[in-house]
């Protein structure tokens, strides 16, 4: 499974996404032959990319609790992560944009905390990278659009009401700066 296609671009490399979302992708690989990997992107300059890459994306998940009325106390090595990018370094930003234009990309996942989905008028789309998460997402989506690639599924996991609608509102505000109108549905 080491060379599986990178189907997921994930903004956020914290415990929640790695223990929940990446776990489910790991199970999909094992039980449903999904055959996919996740590329993580650290959402802020101080992040975990170096540590995750030193471990080749592998980490152990401890599952404790109950399932179907039975006690669970399991360990599982998660292997669904291929690498983690630091977009605050020139090469990491380039790699993020390469993944954005990939034919393999199907899903973008995010958890940049409840403070992450905010429109920042000081954020510039020509910055490398844009300073806000919605700005980075706009860069990725616009790059994908210009490359003529198909649409993707967006899973916003931030803990705010209407997280997807709020994120869409921010992205549309950034698109208006480059004179791209909102998509029609």
Predicted regions and their residues:
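Short, low-complexity, polar/charged sequence segments that are solvent-exposed and flexible
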Residues: 27-30, 57-62, 126-130, 173-176
């Amino acid at each position: 499974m080491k060379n599986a296609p990178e189907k997921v671009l994930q903004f956020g490399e914290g415990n929640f996404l790695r223990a929940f979302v990446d776990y489910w992708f790991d199970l999909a690989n094992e039980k449903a032959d999904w055959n996919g990997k996740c590329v993580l992107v650290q959402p802020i300059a101080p992040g975990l990319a170096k540590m995750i890459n030193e471990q080749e994306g592998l980490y152990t998940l401890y599952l404790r609790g109950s399932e179907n009325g039975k006690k669970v106390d399991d360990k599982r090595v998660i292997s669904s992560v291929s690498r983690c990018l630091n977009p605050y370094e020139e090469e990491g930003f380039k790699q993020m944009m390469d993944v954005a234009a990939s034919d393999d990309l199907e899903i973008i996942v995010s958890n940049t905390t409840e403070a992450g989905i905010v429109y920042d008028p000081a954020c510039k789309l020509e910055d490398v990278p844009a300073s806000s998460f919605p700005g980075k997402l706009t860069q990725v989506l616009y790059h994908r659009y210009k490359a003529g690639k198909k649409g993707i599924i967006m899973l916003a996991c931030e803990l705010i009401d209407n997280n997807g609608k709020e994120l869409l509102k921010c992205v549309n505000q950034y698109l208006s700066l480059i004179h791209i109108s909102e998509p029609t549905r």
